[in-house]
C-alpha cells in the first residue's frame, strides 16, 4: 500500500483468493489478511444478547441466559420392521378381498403389531408415548383406586339390604278366651261351609267367597273384649247368607232370559259401577274388582269387542257380561 501511495497510481495485478474465507486480495494484502482470517475462524464468537443492551440504564434486572438443553439421543429407526408389517397388512387385505369374491372361509386376521418404543400401562394395558405415559399412569392409578373403593361400598350396602330383608317380626302370642278351649280368638278368616253368591253370573256359574259367620259373631261378642261370652245358640243364621230366591240351578233355562235379568237386577251408573238390589237392600260392585273372565264377543249380537276394557257392545249397546 505504501508503494501505491508513493506512486499515486493504482497497480493492476492478479488477485489471489484467501484459503479460509475465499475472498480475493492483492498479494501484499493477502499476507496481512491470512493470519487474521485464520484467528477469527478458529475463535468462537459470543452470541449478542440484545436484551441486556436494552436493559442497561433501567431498573430491569438482567436475566440469566438459559442454558441450552442437550439434545436427546436419536433412537435407532425400525424401518425394516415397519416395512414388513406394512407388507403383511397389504397381503392380508388382498387375501380377504379374493376370498370375498370367490367365496369360502375367511382367513384369520393378522396379529396386532405393537410399537416397542411405547410404554404399556399396568392398569388398563394400553400403550402410550413416554411423555403421555407419565401423565396417564398417575391418572389411571387414581381411577383404579376409586373403582375398587366403589366396589367395597357396594358390597357393604348389599349386606345391609339383605339383613333388612331377612328380618322377621316376632310372633304374636295367642290368648285363649275363658269360654272357649280352641284357638278361636284369631282374627284371620277360616274356611267354612257358607259362601257368598255373586249376582248376575251367567249359565248358573256361582263364584263363592269363603267366610265364617262364627268368626264375625266371635269378634262382635263380649268374649273378644275380655268379657266371658254367654252361651251361643246353634240355630243362629249367618248374616251374609244367600236368600233362597237368588239361588240358581244350572239345569234351569237361564240362557234365554239374560237380557231381562241384567236389565231388572242391575242399575248402571255413568262411572262404571252398578247396584244390584234384592230383598229391599242394595249391594254395590265394581267390575274391575271381580275375578271373572271377560268374553271377547257380545252375548246378544255376537259382535267382537274392539278393546279389552270395553263395558258395552258397540253394535247393540248391551252391557258386557262377566263370566
From Swiss-Prot:
UniProt-annotated binding residues for Zn(2+) 2: 121, 124, 136, 140
Lineage: superkingdom: Eukaryota
Low complexity composition bias: residue spans: 198-214
Q: Which residues cross the membrane?
A: none
InterPro entries, from UniProt? ZC2HC1A/B-like, Znf_C2HC_C3H
Cofactor names from the entry are: Zn(2+)
Compositionally biased intervals (Polar residues):
177-197
Q: Which UniProt keywords apply?
A: Metal-binding, Phosphoprotein, Repeat, Zinc, Zinc-finger
Q: Where is the signal peptide?
A: none
Composition bias (Basic and acidic residues) maps to 47-57
Q: Mention one GO molecular function.
A: zinc ion binding
Q: Where are the zinc fingers (C2HC/C3H-type)?
A: 14-43, 117-146
Show the segment(s) annotated as Disordered: 42-81, 149-258
Q: Which residues carry this modification: Phosphothreonine?
A: 242
Binding residues for Zn(2+) 1, per the UniProt record?
A: 18, 21, 33, 37
Q: Which Pfam families match?
A: zf-C2HC_2
Residue numbers carrying Phosphoserine: 221, 290
What is the similarity comment for this entry?
Answer: Belongs to the ZC2HC1 family.
Name of the protein in its database record: Zinc finger C2HC domain-containing protein 1A
Q: Could you tell me which species this protein originates from?
A: Bos taurus
Amino acid at each position: 500500500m505504501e508503494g501505491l501511495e508513493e506512486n499515486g497510481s493504482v497497480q493492476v495485478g492478479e488477485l489471489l483468493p484467501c484459503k479460509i474465507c475465499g475472498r480475493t486480495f492483492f498479494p501484499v494484502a493477502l499476507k496481512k489478511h491470512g493470519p487474521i482470517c485464520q484467528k477469527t475462524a478458529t475463535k468462537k464468537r459470543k452470541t449478542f444478547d440484545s436484551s441486556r443492551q436494552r436493559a442497561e440504564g433501567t431498573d430491569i434486572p438482567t436475566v440469566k441466559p438459559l442454558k441450552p438443553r442437550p439434545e436427546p439421543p436419536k433412537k435407532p429407526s425400525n424401518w425394516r420392521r415397519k416395512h414388513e408389517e406394512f407388507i403383511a397388512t397389504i397381503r392380508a387385505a388382498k387375501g380377504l378381498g379374493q376370498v370375498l369374491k370367490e367365496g369360502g372361509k375367511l382367513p384369520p386376521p393378522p396379529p396386532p403389531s405393537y410399537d416397542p418404543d411405547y410404554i404399556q400401562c399396568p392398569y388398563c394395558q394400553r400403550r402410550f408415548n413416554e411423555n403421555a405415559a407419565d401423565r396417564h399412569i398417575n391418572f389411571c392409578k387414581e381411577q383404579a383406586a376409586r373403582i375398587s373403593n366403589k366396589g367395597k361400598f357396594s358390597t357393604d350396602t348389599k349386606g345391609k339390604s339383605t339383613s333388612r330383608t331377612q328380618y322377621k317380626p316376632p310372633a304374636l302370642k295367642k290368648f285363649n278366651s275363658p269360654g272357649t278351649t280352641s284357638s278361636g280368638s284369631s282374627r284371620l278368616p277360616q274356611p267354612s261351609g257358607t259362601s257368598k253368591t255373586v249376582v248376575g253370573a251367567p249359565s248358573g256359574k256361582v263364584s263363592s267367597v269363603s267366610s265364617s259367620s262364627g268368626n264375625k259373631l266371635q269378634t262382635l261378642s263380649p268374649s273378644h273384649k275380655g268379657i266371658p261370652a254367654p252361651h251361643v245358640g246353634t240355630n243362629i243364621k249367618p248374616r251374609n247368607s244367600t236368600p233362597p230366591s237368588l239361588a240358581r240351578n244350572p239345569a234351569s233355562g237361564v240362557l234365554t232370559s239374560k237380557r231381562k235379568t241384567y236389565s231388572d237386577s242391575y242399575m248402571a251408573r255413568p262411572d262404571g259401577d252398578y247396584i244390584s238390589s234384592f230383598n229391599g237392600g242394595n249391594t254395590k260392585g265394581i267390575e274391575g274388582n271381580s275375578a271373572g273372565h271377560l268374553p271377547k264377543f257380545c252375548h246378544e249380537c255376537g259382535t267382537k269387542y274392539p278393546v279389552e276394557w270395553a263395558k258395552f257392545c258397540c253394535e247393540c249397546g248391551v252391557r258386557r257380561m262377566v263370566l
